[in-house]
Amino acid sequence: MARMVHCVKLNKEAEGLDFPPLPGELGKKLWQSVSKEAWAGWLKHQTMLINENRLNMADSRARQYLLKQTEKYFFGDGADEAAGYVPPPSA
């Protein structure tokens, strides 16, 4: 049976993550209160941030930026949006 959590992003009961997605306290907090559906939404948003801002993931500043954005996305006032980003048309 799937582990259920009250998702902080979707504000509903949903299937929880199978394991903490990140190390440390933030990973534990995400595992306890974020659903698979919301995490999939974050991965899409994270990809957009990496691509549109041309982040180099070998750069520790880029990784720290994404960690802060992860926390803002789920527990704050929302993550940054890329200026001028237009989502691709739905198929």
Swiss-Prot record:
A Pfam match: Iron_traffic
GO molecular function: iron ion binding
Presence of keyword Iron: yes
Entry-linked InterPro entries: Fe_traffick_prot_YggX, Fe_traffick_prot_YggX_sf
Signal peptide from the UniProt entry: none
Function: Could be a mediator in iron transactions between iron acquisition and iron-requiring processes, such as synthesis and/or repair of Fe-S clusters in biosynthetic enzymes.
Residue ranges crossing the lipid bilayer per the database entry: none
Family indicated by similarity: Belongs to the Fe(2+)-trafficking protein family.
Keywords associated with the record: Iron
Protein's recorded name: Probable Fe(2+)-trafficking protein
Entry keyword Iron: yes
Naturally occurring in which organism (per UniProt): Ralstonia pickettii (strain 12J)
GO cellular component, one term: cytosol
Any GO BP annotation: cellular response to oxidative stress
